[in-house]
Every structure is written in C-alpha cells, then in structure tokens.
Amino acid sequence: MESRPWFVTKQLEDGVYLISEPPHVNSFLILGDHDAVLFDTGMGIGNIKAVVSELTDREVLVVNSHYHFDHSGGNKLFERIAIHESGVKPLSEDVPPEWLTAYMDFSERMLEKFKIYRELDEAYFHLLHVDMFPRPFPSEFDPSKWAVVPTVASRALHEGDVLDLGRRALEVIHTPGHTPDCICLLDRRSGALFVGDTLCAGPHYSHLPDSDVDASAISTRRLATEFYRDVNVVYPCHILRYALDPKFIVEVADGFQAMIEGRAERDLGHDIFGEDAGRYRFNRFSIFVPPAWQPDASAPAGTTEAER
C-alpha cells in the first residue's frame, strides 16, 4: 500500500476542518475568533495534536461526542477536555484490552477486503478517491502495544450548554442512545450539525451493553423535529463519509420509528467485533439491535415526513 500520512485534513467550510483517519473515524476542528473546539480526538494512533497545531494557534477545547475509544484516543495529548456529564466516569476508566485487540483484527480484515474493493472500483465503478484509502500505521505505532489512556474531563457538559468560540457558538444537544453520553453540536449560524455516532451513514450500533434503542429513537426524532430547520449540513464520524444532507436526519428518525413499530424487516448481522446483532436495513444506513430485542407494537405512530 502506498505511503500516505495517517490523517487526512480538509477545509469543509469557513472555520471548519475535517481531520480524518480513513476509513476509521472523523474528527472535526471548529474555529471561532478566539477559541477552537476539537470534536473528538480519534483513535490515538497518530498525533492529532500536531495536526491541530498546523491548522490553528487558538486555545483548543476537546469535546468528546461520547466516551468510546475511537473518539477519545487522542485525549491524552490535550489539557482541556469536555464530555457530557454521563460520560465523565466511563471516560476515566480503562478501555478493555480485548476491545482494542478485536478492533485491530477487524482492521486487518478490512485492509485485505479494501484491496478487492479498490480493484473492483477501478475496473467498474470509479467512486473512490485517494482521501478514502486506508493508511498504513505510522512508523512509531506498534499495534501490539496500542492502548487508550483514560482521561479526566476538565468540564462536564449538559443539554443546552453553549460553547462561545468568538463569533461562533456551538449548542450542546444531548442525544443518548448509542451510549448514554452521546451529544451533537449545532452551529445555528452556519447550520452545521456535528453528530458523532448519533447519526451514521452505515450501521447504527444500538446493540452495545449500554446502548438504548428507545433512547436512540427519541434522540433522532428530536433532531428531526426540533432542530431540522436549523441544519444545512450534517457532519458524521464514520463510514468514509464526512458530510450528509439534512434529510438524512429525517430518514434515520423514520427508520427507528418503523423498526420500533414492527414495520421494518430484520435479518442477522455482525458487528466489527464479530458479535451477533439483529439488523434492520434502510436505504442509506442500517440499525443493529440486541439479538433478543423485539419491536413494541404499542409505540406511537407518526413520522417526521408529516411533521415537516
């Protein structure tokens, strides 16, 4: 595989930069006149702070979308770290080593499959571009010694908090479901919605031990009803996509609603760790639920298509 930098950086709009670790995860640097927010710090495999320093000299506050290791791996490089109040404790706890081992195993399989994918794309489809290609690990990184250092948050965030960066304000929206501490950040002036793992153009992991399917349905419905008209672009964190149209919010909310009401078809899926999950497939995404989870026929009907 060709040698390329671990991180891909791209200016998405005025004062907003993508810092991607393709195809693993996206982080976003958001600049105001006097301060900056780094929304997630990625895997902790490369030095994301060095990348940030090349883009800005403003004081940086890390805001974790949630506590998972693929979003907080670079926290150790920063002093100012904020997370929703319900994520403070798990952020400070050790990441189970088996999670990291399983992720490395998945990464190896993914790299092998990508070679086939790239060959097919070059022959037939022509959809990939160089920014999507997986990178080799940095020379200083030893996969066998990969560890995500627990970090202590310097600030606990709450629903409705506003982060004033100077001529840019980011509103904290608590969106539990994937994890209890999931948040989104909304810049009402530009219409940018940074969604972490609340919205994903791929599998939504609602089957994990601290996931809550009903909470995910409520959170996505809330985004689609209370905030939809304020959104011009959605910035997600996974699956080789870093910008989505606002209608995607509605699609996901309607998908969760259809699933809960028993109006969606289900099959068997497997997550990146090889664990079984119930899988619901939709046009631009899927939803994983615990194998024993069942729809609730008494759930209230209604879709955002009507509400809009």
Write out the residue ranges for each language-model feature.
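Structural signal for conserved beta-strand scaffold positions within catalytic alpha/beta enzyme cores
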Residues: 11, 18, 64, 82-83, ...
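Active-site HxH/HxHxD metal-binding segment of metal-dependent hydrolases
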Residues: 45-164, 201, 247, 251-266
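Metallo-beta-lactamase
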Residues: 35-36, 43-44, 145-148, 154-155, ...
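Conserved beta-strand hairpin/beta-sheet module of binuclear metal-dependent hydrolase folds
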Residues: 5-54, 185-200
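Accessory terminal helices/loops
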Residues: 1, 135-137, 202, 218-308
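Residues that act as N-cap/strand-start positions at coil-to-secondary-structure junctions
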Residues: 3-4, 13, 22-24, 149-151, ...
